[in-house]
Amino acid sequence: MAGSARSAMAAKALQTILNIGLLALATILVIFLVKETFHLAKVLLISSEKDSSYQLIEGIVIYFLYFEFIALIVKYFQSGYHFPLRYFIYIGITAIIRLIIVDHKSPSDTLVYSAAILLLVVTLYLANSNRLKRE
C-alpha cells in the first residue's frame, strides 16, 4: 500500500513538473507568435523587395507552426493530459510544406517531400478512421 501511494505521489509530482514546463513553453510560443505577427506586418506593409512575397509566405507558414504548437498544448490540457496524434501529423505536414517553400531547388527533393506529405495525409486518414478511434 505504501509503495503504491509513493508511486501515485511521484506520478503527480512529475505531472505537475510537466504541466509547468508546458505552460512555460506555451508562454514562449505566444511571445514568438506575437513577434512573428509584427514581422508579417512589416513584410506586408513596409517591404517592397522582390523577395518579400517569399518572406511573407514563409512567415505565414511559420506562424501556423507556432499556432499549431500552441493548439497542441491547449488540447493537451483539455483532453486530460493527452497529446492527440493528429496534431503532431498536422505539425509535420505544415513543417514539410514550409521546407518545400524554402528549399525547392531540387526537383527530386521536392518529390520526396510531397510523398512524405501524402504519407502523412494517409496516416491522418487512418488515425481518424473508426477502426482506430478510442472509445
UniProtKB/Swiss-Prot annotation:
Gene Ontology CC entries for this record: plasma membrane
Keyword terms of this UniProt record: Cell inner membrane, Cell membrane, Membrane, Transmembrane, Transmembrane helix
Membrane-traversing stretches: 14-34, 54-74, 82-102, 107-127
Membrane topology: Multi-pass membrane protein
Record keyword Cell membrane present: yes
Pfam families, per database record: PsiE
Keyword Transport: no
Cellular compartment(s): Cell inner membrane
HAMAP family: PsiE (MF_01048)
Recorded family membership: Belongs to the PsiE family.
Cited NCBIfam families: PRK02833.1-2, PRK02833.1-3
UniProt name for this protein: Protein PsiE homolog
Organism in which the protein naturally occurs: Pectobacterium atrosepticum (strain SCRI 1043 / ATCC BAA-672)
Gene that encodes the chain: psiE
